[in-house]
């Protein structure tokens, strides 16, 4: 199967390793890594938690949709998406049509460990929620959407970002052209 598209999109729940693997993919391919949440923060001058607080999740998702639309117009990029990017049909369509979609998975315990290590328990969907239960709930809702979009799927529980990035590139080259 050939897919003549040059962007690589990383999808999955928070703590799945999208940014870590994306950073290694960017180094190996000499491409620019974009993180959609960080790009939203740059554009607005506000952090994601503040946007959620002031505009609610709907306001954040609107900003996310605009950012995804802009980033999908670029070529030869690596994009680590926000975990909820799949909730919007337009996002799913644009991402699927403009690149190879890599779904990174991890156990809930691994995700919690990674999120805690990064000091990211302030994430908007964690505030006022039991973290483990919230991740399980998010996974139940989003997993079918991630799976439907995914061209390739990788578990990251025993993550070595460099090795996984190398394997992803090998698999992409074996499966698709022009990447």
Swiss-Prot record:
The positions annotated for binding Mg(2+) are: 19
Cellular component GO terms held in the UniProt record: cytosol
Organism superkingdom: Bacteria
Q: Where does the chain bind ATP?
A: 15-20, 122
From the UniProt record, give the pathway where this protein acts. Metabolic intermediate biosynthesis; chorismate biosynthesis; chorismate from D-erythrose 4-phosphate and phosphoenolpyruvate: step 5/7
Q: Where does substrate bind?
A: 37, 61, 83, 142
| Enzyme Commission designation | 2.7.1.71
Instruction: Give the co-factor note.
Output: Binds 1 Mg(2+) ion per subunit.
Please give the cofactor(s) recorded in the UniProt entry for this protein.
Mg(2+)
Q: Which reaction does it catalyse?
A: shikimate + ATP = 3-phosphoshikimate + ADP + H(+)
The entry's localization annotation reads: Cytoplasm
Q: What is an annotated GO biological process for this record, any one?
A: chorismate biosynthetic process
Task: Give the principal location in a single coarse category.
Answer: cytoplasm
Keywords from the named record? Amino-acid biosynthesis, Aromatic amino acid biosynthesis, ATP-binding, Cytoplasm, Kinase, Magnesium, Metal-binding, Nucleotide-binding, Transferase
GO molecular function annotations of the record: ATP binding; magnesium ion binding; shikimate kinase activity
Name the Pfam families on file: SKI
* Family, as annotated: Belongs to the shikimate kinase family.
Subunit structure comment from the entry: Monomer.
The role this protein plays is: Catalyzes the specific phosphorylation of the 3-hydroxyl group of shikimic acid using ATP as a cosubstrate.
Protein name (record) = Shikimate kinase
